[in-house]
């Protein structure tokens, strides 16, 4: 049943992680049915986090979460796309990989100081074992005899879209864990008897060392065409993330229901009875949508054709980074680094020192933060590296705050001689990459949104003029600066709302996140006294802060009224529309706040 409900939750949400949810669900089910009856004495959490639909499904089945939440995965005020401690039985926030064992160690220390006895079960992924923090966390757990910790490795052999062995082979992981002083047990993680035997074996160990149970599992277990064993070793696994098509959903549901009913018949129990829920139809727009990732992918190949020193790197995100065409075109110049961002960035540093031009790709949230020190170190060597951060900004909102990159501008702002750009449309993506490759002498950061977008105002630009922007909507009363298609589209729509109220809002696309041409800035604002900035980022540390620091030096700065819009709180999880509305970044709320600002009211 838990797999059936998990499948429904992901289909209804429109996105999620089926493969890892299905590989881990038997482990989670067994733990909750047999080991976790008393939360004060035993707890469980997932370090990898993206398997959380399976955990939600188990908790709902045991009536530990309200049943109606089954309809609210990745919805506002519902169940986040990655674990969040605001939800009952979520003991840590996860989604950013590698932190779970360290969190468990901290809990053990706190429990010991408070004379509290509690067993802690942690689930990690096998791809997650490529993160350096995992290995940093092991030795002291053994040295301090933290037998309270039992780690399950969901060893489903596939990370994201490809086999672990083809991405960054783990080698003999049993010997590796033993070398760090851990007890090591192996089991079939999709077989209850094997899981039970491994836990019984663990409980009978007399030493005080922590234990790792390497659970061999099948990614997508339970649905034949979703199981990773159905693909060849060179094929891409198709069910890591996203949602199944209608036909895939019907076929998968039928297979799961049939298997469950066969078991119930053997037990003499009635077959399953289901409540039908209408499928929410997808809102398909007839408007032309732009794809910045597709444009980036094409532009990178074009630049690589001209420059043999360009190499591309990514951290287990070849599909999301748009690099499959690059790998096919330049197989010898593509480097898959696995889930190891710090190592990837330092490798890029070595490549740059020896004359290559690395283009380093990952999600913006992971690329800007985890290897931040390595990026700075590379910059001190005065080499040239291009960093490309995808999944930037507050939407898509379904993944939750671990993946919503809303502090990357601030995180990278202190890097010397470092330019940051967020393009607005497809042509500007090409121009941005061309600028970074051919016109900027040091390192750079291109910030990209993955969402196909519809733009009310579009334009073509042959090249970028550093520090200068483009007016999308002309206006006389207020000037608004922003960047990227998501916030600028909302700003353009807000200008149309304000026009009906006789407020004229000029909307300017300024793709330069940490640089502005002062003379240009003066020229576009000289006739207004009200300035607004809109960041797809926290207000602190974003483009708005940078521009405010420039306006302070203007001779007539005391006459300028300045409003910074953006995020103040941890990003909400939900649909894109829900998330923008929750943070007052949608057109309607922007229009209200800008009108109040113009009229002298507090917002």
Write out the residue ranges for each language-model feature.
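Thiamine diphosphate
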Residues: 1-121, 261-447, 452-453, 463, ...
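Residue(s) in the substrate-gating loop at a strand-loop-helix junction
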Residues: 126
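Short active-site segment of divalent metal-dependent hydrolases/proteases
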Residues: 129
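Short hydrophobic segments within beta-strands
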Residues: 47, 123, 152, 313, ...
